[in-house]
Amino acid sequence: MVPEFNRDGRLPAGIHWATWQEVQSRFGFSSRRQQLLGGLGLALAALKLNRAGCSRVYIDGSFVTVKRGPGDYDACWDIDGVNVEALDSVFLDFSKGRTAQKRKYFGEFFPAQMPEGASGRVFLEFFQTDKETGRSKGIVGLNLQEAKL
């Protein structure tokens, strides 16, 4: 279950597990967010299906805040058990600011265990830190093995 936003408009620190239906209900409160959810749903299905076998995805960025019109969403996917040969190659294309990912799925995806360039922390940890303040913040976790997409 996803908790209420804090006074900064963010989720409290930690990974907040939710179902796909909860994510749609909680974060789909504007037409822009509905559009982003459409792309995210396609991406989640691609990570889960086609024998890729991804089991967990974590959602971050302004999408999991009170911002009414986020530009996109940021996500990282757990590499454990993933069949890279079955993975949509766009999930491994980080060129040109991840333009191909944004064009296809309206968001950006990173392997959760890959280090973020500037900080050196893996994306799963990097996503849980506010870039401006350095304080801990919350993200949303999805268990794709249980997700009904």
Describe these PLM feature segments.
Residues M1-D60, V64-G71, I79-L149:
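Catalytic core of pol beta-like nucleotidyltransferases
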Residues C76:
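Aromatic/basic-lined ligand-recognition segments
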